[in-house]
A protein has these predicted regions:
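Short, glycine/acidic-rich hinge or "gate" loops at secondary-structure transitions
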Residues: 78-83, 196-197, 313-329, 538-539
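Intrinsically disordered, low-complexity segments enriched in small/polar residues
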Residues: 324-346
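Bacterial flagellar/type III secretion structural subunits and associated motility module proteins
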Residues: 1-47, 68-199, 204-310, 339-506, ...
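Structured, hydrophobic secondary-structure cores that serve as assembly/anchoring elements
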Residues: 311-314, 318, 508-541
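Juxtamembrane membrane-water interface segments immediately C-terminal to a transmembrane helix
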Residues: 39, 50-53, 512
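Acidic/charged coordination and interface sites in well-structured regions
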Residues: 65
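Long, contiguous alpha-helical "rod/stalk" segments
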Residues: 54-62
Length: 542
């Protein structure tokens, strides 16, 4: 750092020591070393704060990654707050050409029989072959040409038509191909395709079911266009609902009930069916213990990684240059020190200087203690230990350990209890502004995942409380991409250090200039004395 400061300060071209023969630059630099040392010290303090902030942010990112994976409702496969996530089944069907199925949370029955009488279909129309060519048109024909050929009305040099009540407008200088794209991209709910090989159009509704339709007869332009393209447009075309009988369900007259759905994929009592053909199929579900176990294990493994990371940060000691408990702590290198070292030496030094900066950090201790409590305290449904998940020693951060056999047995024997331990939800919603009484009540009524969710919210929440506060870790170190990246405690301290550094450099510059002026006066005086001495010598020697 001393040399960098010298570079900043020595921006003037100076001619020094001409009369005295002294190395004025070296003398001045030596005389301001105390001030340079002050700047170096504050720069080191600033660097330590920046490294500390980086350490905090690495933990923030780890917690956010954990939250994104297991607490995101948009990721149902790993959303551990939902009971549905814990119910997994193996599914077998006797005829996949009739129907397939998968579980969607807890199912009411494990065996089902489905008789498919009709698949859901889209509304569909096909044009006669070659009709476009017979009208002397092509897909590249201008809308004006299409209008003239098919008797369409243009207004303000635009074609307007309605399909399913949705108006579509296009300029006369556009092409038929552009019109097809405009229809497909509109909210009319239909899609048109064209085969140049067959010179044939196909129109389909985007949705299936009896409510899906293609209505072009209510608008003269639309009717004439489609008629001219070779379609039969005498009536509105409708799709079809899927029709099936499920599990022999009967009505009051003893007749099997025919159920209709507007799609071939639908969910009934936790089972999602996909119909593939007409016929009968039997579907059997069996609980997939291994899949449920793996979901829980993945969650616990990620939790343990966080516990291990934070435990390491709050317990690792700052190394000293003289070994254990001896010598000074490793500090950030000054520029002068860096210039005297190799890249490898610098890397090794900085690794040590970055170690132990969060030792005994109270904020991280708080995260750790609350996470441990959330997972280890009893819930109203029992504790994790009762299903084979126990806490290790405090020396290894009290990580959780899974007894695979015991957990799998708990899943097989009483999955509902396992789910309740993890996901039981309080009637009180999370809020950073909840009173201590409400927090205590919510904690008591919640499962371990809900409790852990509250911890994450308190520490890495990006929304503000009524007092304007975000998560505690964000207020401390900030989150990249969030307003707290620049508005947080550590960044404020870093900026204050930078301001102080600039203040010290300004004072150092002033002192250096003052010294150079004094030496310049000295050089001038010596030069005059030398000139006088020469004059006396010359005159007395005559």
């Amino acid at each position: 750092m001393a040399s960098s400061i010298s570079n900043i300060l020595n921006t003037k071209l100076r001619f020094t020591g001409m009369a005295s023969g002294l190395d004025t630059d070296a003398i001045v630099q030596q005389m301001i070393r105390v001030q340079q040392a002050k700047v170096d010290k504050v720069k080191q303090e600033k660097q330590l704060l920046e490294w500390k902030r980086d350490d905090y942010r690495s933990i923030i990112n780890m917690l956010r990654s954990f939250k994104d994976e297991f607490f995101d409702v948009l990721k149902p496969a790993t959303y551990m707050r939902s009971s549905s996530t814990y119910y997994a089944y193996k599914v077998k069907t006797t005829d996949e050409n009739v129907a397939t199925a998968k579980s969607n949370g807890k199912v009411a029955m494990m065996e089902h029989t489905i008789k498919v009488e009709q698949l859901a279909e889209k509304a569909k129309m096909e044009s006669r072959v070659g009709e476009l060519g017979l009208n002397g048109l092509s897909m590249d024909s201008k809308i004006s040409e299409v209008a003239n050929s098919l008797g369409l009305n243009l207004e303000d040099n635009k074609l307007s038509l309605e399909i399913n009540g949705e108006e579509i407008k296009i300029s006369a200088d556009k092409t038929l191909n552009d019109l097809i794209s405009a229809i497909n991209n509109s909210d009319a709910g239909v899609r048109i395709s064209y085969s140049s090989f067959l010179d044939k159009f196909i129109v389909e509704s985007k949705a299936t079911g009896a409510d899906a339709k293609i209505d072009v007869i209510s608008n003269s332009n639309a009717k004439n266009l489609f008629y001219g393209l070779g379609f039969d447009v005498d009536e509105v075309k409708y799709g079809k609902n899927a029709k099936f009988k499920l599990d022999g369900k009967k009505d009051s007259n003893g007749q099997e009930v025919i159920t209709e759905k507007n799609s071939n994929t639908f969910t009934i009592d936790g089972v999602t069916y996909t119909l593939t053909g007409v016929g009968e199929a039997k579907i059997t579900l069996t609980q997939d213990t291994d899949a449920i176990y793996e979901k829980i294990k993945s969650f616990i493994d990620k939790y343990n990684e966080i516990v291990e990371k934070i435990t390491t940060k709050v317990t690792e000691k700052r190394p000293r240059s003289g070994g254990t408990d001896k010598g000074d702590y490793y500090l950030p290198l000054t520029d002068e020190q860096r210039e005297a070292m190799t890249e490898d030496e610098i890397k090794k030094w900085e690794e040590k200087a970055k170690t132990g900066l969060l030792r005994n950090d109270s904020l991280l201790h708080g995260v750790l203690e609350r996470m441990r409590s959330a997972m280890n305290d009893l819930t109203e449904a029992g504790g994790l230990f009762s299903i084979g998940i126990s806490t290790g020693s405090w020396r290894n951060g009290a990580k959780l350990f899974i007894d695979e056999d015991k957990l799998k047995k708990a899943i097989e024997d009483n999955l509902d209890k396992v789910v309740e331990i993890f996901t039981k939800t309080s009637e009180i919603s999370y809020s950073p502004d909840n009173s201590s009484e409400l927090r205590d009540k919510r904690y008591k009524e919640s499962g371990v995942v809900e409790r852990l969710f509250d911890v994450l919210q308190d520490y890495i929440r990006t929304t503000r409380s009524e007092s304007g506060q975000k998560g505690l870790l964000l207020e401390k170190a900030g989150l990249v991409g969030d307003v707290t990246e620049y508005q947080n405690t550590l960044t404020k301290q870093i900026n204050e250090k930078q301001d102080y550094i600039q203040e010290l450099i300004n004072k150092l510059y002033e002192k250096q200039e003052s010294l150079y002026i004094k030496f310049a006066y000295m050089e001038t005086a010596l030069s005059r004395m030398s000139a006088q001495s020469s004059w006396f010598t010359q005159n007395f020697n005559r």
